[in-house]
């Protein structure tokens, strides 16, 4: 089972979605909303890959500066805990993950919802996602999938750039000769 977790941080609660990526389609295994402290505990004990949506200051009005600061504390805290505990993670802004996954950085919440409902299987035993949480849970799902796409692209590029054994031996004959 390949576990993938996405976090949509908020000023009061953080949306978290866990997906299984081992099938043909991603499957939502669980979702929840956590406080900043609960999120830190969750991240410290997780295995798999974590994708965190980072805050874009231009997306907030100056009236909500306190909310912006609290949201950034949650995102930065999750990143710090992941780093300290050796959890593989990727941080993406809302525009980055929407652009990476949907090829449209300013995709609407409705477009995100439609893309997720078409792409992701939902475990039948999951509780219903109510309207108040839906946008944030769907953002957590979206950032998780986009985070994995970014990492896969980086790994594919690295593999493409890595020389084959024959090319390496031809380029470095002294380093690859056995001792006599």
Segments from the language model and where they lie:
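Phosphate- and other anionic-substrate recognition elements at nucleic-acid/protein interfaces
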Residues: 1-180
């Amino acid at each position: 089972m390949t576990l993938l977790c996405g976090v949509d941080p908020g000023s009061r609660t953080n949306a978290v979605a866990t997906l299984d990526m081992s099938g043909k389609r991603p499957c939502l295994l669980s979702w929840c909303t956590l406080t900043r402290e609960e999120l830190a505990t969750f991240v410290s004990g997780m295995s798999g890959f974590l994708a965190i949506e980072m805050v874009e200051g231009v997306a907030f009005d100056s009236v909500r500066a306190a909310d912006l600061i609290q949201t950034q504390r949650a995102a930065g805290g999750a990143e710090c805990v992941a780093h300290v505990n050796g959890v593989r993670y990727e941080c993406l802004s809302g525009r980055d993950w929407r652009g990476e996954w949907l090829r449209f950085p300013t995709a609407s919440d409705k477009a995100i919802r439609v893309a997720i409902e078409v792409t992701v299987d939902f475990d039948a035993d999951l509780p219903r996602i109510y309207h108040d949480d839906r946008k944030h849970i769907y953002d957590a799902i979206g950032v998780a999938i986009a985070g994995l796409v970014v990492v896969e692209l980086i790994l594919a590029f690295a593999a493409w750039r890595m020389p084959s054994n024959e090319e390496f031996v031809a380029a470095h004959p002294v380093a690859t000769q056995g001792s006599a």
